[in-house]
Amino acid sequence: MVRAITLLLLISLHSIQAFADNTVVVQTKGSGSSITVQQVGSGNVTGVYCGLGSFDSSLVNTHNCDNATIGVSIDGSSNIAYAQSVWSNHDSQVWSITVDGNDNYAVIDMDQDDNTATIIQNGNDNDALILGSGNNNVYKIEQTGDDMYAKFQTFADNSDIWSTQEGTGNHNVFVFNSNQADNNSTRVIQKGSGNKDADIFWYND
């Protein structure tokens, strides 16, 4: 079991503002890991890799990452958050990325069975992407603000995809479920003024 907690803050006491440009990379393996990363400010990059990672183009060998809980919290603008587990021995995980601010990009790449991935973004011009494979998974993206984009790309059976977008401006949701994917469901809710668009593609056996 691994427990990692990272908190990065750079605060000016005179201006009460946060500045950043920090990079955090967490690579771990093993069952029952608990990882929490919090960043405040702008221009930060966060990468969390459980079981296998390729943040710097070098790979960690595939290992068990069952029953992991991974949480990333971002407060600021122009940040990137990326969380990944790949292909094998990665069941019963809970992944979450929470973002407050504008122009942020969040990705969860999660594989295997009985997992939950959630991205929550509050602000404007934010993008979110969830990639997943395996069975009996739940994928959620919740966005509040102006001009949001959400994308789901899955290779899964018996899974649920939920997207909620609220606010003014242009919102877009893209859902793609690949060939040989059965018994899945999609729920898309879009509220507010402006253009709303949803593209949903299902392919079964």
Protein language model features and the residues they cover:
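Sec/Tat signal peptide C-region and signal peptidase I cleavage site
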Residues: 5, 13-20
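Low-complexity repeat regions of mature extracellularly deployed or surface/particle-associated proteins
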Residues: 20-205
